[in-house]
Amino acid sequence: VQELNVAGAEIARKAADCCERTIIVAGSIGPTGEIIEPLGELTKAEATSAFNDQAIALKEGGVDVAWIESMYSEEEIECAITASKEAGLPILLSSTFDSHGKSMMGHEPKQLVELAERYSPEIIGYGANCGIGASELIGSILCLAKSRNNQAMHLVAKANCGIPEYTDGEIIYNGTAEIMASYACYARKLGATIIGGCCGTKQEHIKAMADALEANDMDCPIELDEIIKSLGEMTKGNMLMIEKYLNLGNSSKVSPVNPRRKRRR
C-alpha cells in the first residue's frame, strides 16, 4: 500500500508541476470492499488504520488533498475522514448514487451534505462521482445543490463517461466528448466548482469539457427535458428523487445556483 501510493502520487505531482499554472493533486481513497460491523465483519479501527496507511503514503508522495470517493457507507466514510485528518490532509468527499438516487446503503444526497458539513472545515467539498452516466449524476448534483447550507464548500461533479459496454473482449464506455462537454456545463450551472470525469474518461473528453466550460456562459434556466435530450435518459427513480428535492411539480425548469466562474489558466 505504502509503495504504490507514494509512487502514484509522485508521478501525478511531477506531471502537475510541469504545468504553467498551479495544479492541485488529489489522492484517491476508495472503499475497502468490506462492510463495517455490525452488518459486516470489518471493525472501524481496522478500516481507519487501513485508510491512514494510504493517506500518509499519498501525502508523502506529494498530494495536496485526500479525495474520499465512491463510498456508500457513512461509517466507512467517517473512518476515511478520521484517517485523512490524522494525516494532515484537507478532504474532498464524493459518493456514488444508484438509479434510485441513493447510495448502496440507502443514503440520500442530503445525508451526504449533512455529513460533509458536519466535518467542515476539514472537508472542503463534497459531491457525486461514478454512477451510471452523466445524466444520472447531474440528477444527484441537483439534489446535493438543493440540500447544501454552507455555500463556501466546493460542490463536486465527477461523472462516468457514459455506460460501460462489453465489446470484443473490452469494456468500452459509450460517452462521447460532446456529451461530457454538455455535462460539464450543466454541472457548473448547478453550482459545481470542481468538475471532472470518472470511469472511461480520456484526454479528449477532458479537453472537450475544459473548452466548453471556457466558452459557454449557460445563463438561461436549465430544462430537465433539455438535460435528458443532451445527456441521455434518467431513470424513474432518479426523476422521483429530483422532484422530491426540488419540488418541481409541473415545472421542468431549474434555476442556476451559482454565477458563472471563469476557469483559471
Predicted regions span which residues?
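Domain-level signal for soluble alpha/beta catalytic cores
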Residues: 1-265
